[in-house]
Amino acid sequence: MSDTTAIANVFKLIEEYDIKFVLLRFTDIKGKEHGVSLPVNLVDEDLFEDGKMFDGSSVEGWKAINKADMLLMPMPETAVVDPFAQIPTLSLRCSIYEPSTMQSYDRDPRSIAIRAENYMRSTGIADEALFGPEPEFFLFDDVRFDVSMNRSSYSVDDIEAAWNTNKKYEDGNNAYRPLKKGGYCAVAPIDSAHDIRSEMCLILEEMGLVIEAHHHEVATAGQNEIATRFNTLTTKADETQIYKYVVQNVAYEHGKTACFMPKPITGDNGSGMHCNMSLSKDGKNVFQGDKYAGLSETALYYIGGIIKHAKALNAFTNPSTNSYKRLVPGFEAPVLLAYSASNRSASIRIPAVTNPKAIRIEARFPDPLANPYLAFAALLMAGLDGIINKIHPGDAMDKNLYDLPPEELQNIPAVASSLEEALNALEQDYEFLTKGNVFTQAFIDAFITIKRKEVERLNMTPHPVEFEMYYA
């Protein structure tokens, strides 16, 4: 869709749905969405040329207060009617621009994703990078947490939770709930959220996403997944933000709360965001070939780049301290940096396909707290580095990696074991990200500073488990 056609479509939607406000949405470094709403009478064609000024100093990691002015530049092709606004509202996703140069801001995650795609095209390796993330989430009935000088606690609860088998309910306990690790593809009445997910799917379709399936996930306490069709990198990152927005709002309307934390409960599976990837050139799948599992040599090199840079990638694909409570053996989390066909214990899997044209790779270590613009861009840059430098990943590992003896395990590299380790790796291994000025040094430094504050805060906070282990 050309800009002219896309802009015309914006005004068509405004008229068709009697839109009263236009919400300009943007994403910060941490992946959180923000928005500014404009009365519809202020929305004209000039908005798509001049943008809307806002205070960049109020967004963590962006501008100093003495250089705060920045521009929200709406992208007309992202226009979609907000299904949750009571007053008719049109949503437009924005990139961030510098008003002095009218160029994209180097710390804007969406602009980083666009630069990654442009860099890929400049190499001649591919025209399109296709991403298909699979974010998992929990639906809870009740979430509470308290952090102060003299106490620290949290609790989550859900009618599906295994710990509620003996709980007294006013209408009685019907006992239909998945036990620990017993929820995969459960059906009603054990799966209490089927209709909620179906409603999410219908709204996602209204907003332009293509739904492939939805189902209950492995964990107890309401773990779910909705699978959507792949798309090009930046567009899929946009769609991932829409996905989270819809899941959170539909849950809220049903008296539930959606949780995208990788490990909100102890002793059961966490939530991942497996990322399916392939490259396309002239309409052909670059990853299709005659090597292992139907991959091309280019695809193997792409895998090699991801494995080589995995610990640095973890800073973007697993950007929270909570992420590393998921990345431990025993809960279907892929911690070992190996690749294999259909082997879900490997961190990089080659899913089985019925059509060779659909061949792809799946990175299994990312989680849904990742900023999709940064995570997808970083994965692409690592893969491209592998292709350019012909980094072969070695032999595939087709055995169950969870059952390997210690002498074999020590020869297989692993993902980072903490956010601190991931940030240390990123400090040392970042040049593959700065090619083509995709990620700038200033952005990487700002990102590390923000994330180190999170690590330091957790490190300085006494934990209830410490009292259990050490108090008496």
From Swiss-Prot:
Reaction(s) catalysed (UniProt annotation): L-glutamate + NH4(+) + ATP = L-glutamine + ADP + phosphate + H(+)
GS catalytic domain boundaries: 109-472
UniProt note on regulation of activity: The activity of this enzyme could be controlled by adenylation under conditions of abundant glutamine.
Span of domain GS beta-grasp: 17-101
Gene: glnA
Quaternary assembly: Oligomer of 12 subunits arranged in the form of two hexameric ring.
InterPro entries from the UniProt entry: Gln_synt_N (IPR008147), Gln_synt_N_sf (IPR036651), Gln_synth/guanido_kin_cat_dom (IPR014746), Gln_synth_cat_dom (IPR008146), Gln_synth_gly_rich_site (IPR027303), Gln_synth_I (IPR004809), Gln_synth_I_adenylation_site (IPR001637), Gln_synth_N_conserv_site (IPR027302)
Binding site for Mg(2+) 2: 136, 217, 225
Binding site for L-glutamate: 269-270, 326, 332, 344, 364
Binding site for ATP: 212, 276-278, 344, 349, 357
Keyword Nucleotide-binding: yes
E.C. designation(s): 6.3.1.2
Annotated localization: Cytoplasm
Function, in words: Catalyzes the ATP-dependent biosynthesis of glutamine from glutamate and ammonia.
Entry GO MF terms: ATP binding; glutamine synthetase activity; metal ion binding
Protein name (record): Glutamine synthetase
Similarity comment: family membership: Belongs to the glutamine synthetase family.
Residues recorded as bearing O-AMP-tyrosine in the entry: 402
GO biological process: glutamine biosynthetic process; nitrogen utilization
SMART domains, sorted: Gln-synt_C (SM01230)
